[in-house]
Amino acid sequence: MIYGIGLDITELKRIASMAGRQKRFAERILTRSELDQYYELSEKRKNEFLAGRFAAKEAFSKAFGTGIGRQLSFQDIEIRKDQNGKPYIICTKLSQAAVHVSITHTKEYAAAQVVIERLSS
């Protein structure tokens, strides 16, 4: 049974601007593990990675039903990749659910869609 669906799109320019203005922007959005990956990337890929993770976490928060705020933070959500490179989400505040995520980006935008499926108990 579908618990929630979330979609987010963000401009790469906007993320680059925020990262340039706010010194700790990436640290606020990315978990420690995600930051390790981020620091290994070229400058161009860093912005795509950060924008994609931002969009995925926003989409997850919408599917979760709370948005980012008091009940759910960017740090509660981690995007990982399986052995084939397919992204998946780990969230400490969610159990008994399967989470499906798709992340994409173009030259100008990053977008993500998340579906949370409640598993029968």
From Swiss-Prot:
GO molecular function per UniProt: holo-[acyl-carrier-protein] synthase activity; magnesium ion binding
Result when mutating residue 5 to R: Loss of activity; no trimer formation
Pfam families in alphabetical order: ACPS (PF01648)
GO biological process, one term: lysine biosynthetic process via aminoadipic acid
Subcellular localization, as worded in the UniProt entry: Cytoplasm
Function text: Transfers the 4'-phosphopantetheine moiety from coenzyme A to a Ser of fatty acid acyl-carrier-protein ACP. Also modifies the D-alanyl carrier protein but fails to recognize PCP and AcpK, an acyl carrier protein of secondary metabolism.
Name of protein: Holo-[acyl-carrier-protein] synthase
Species this chain originates from: Bacillus subtilis (strain 168)
GN (gene name): acpS
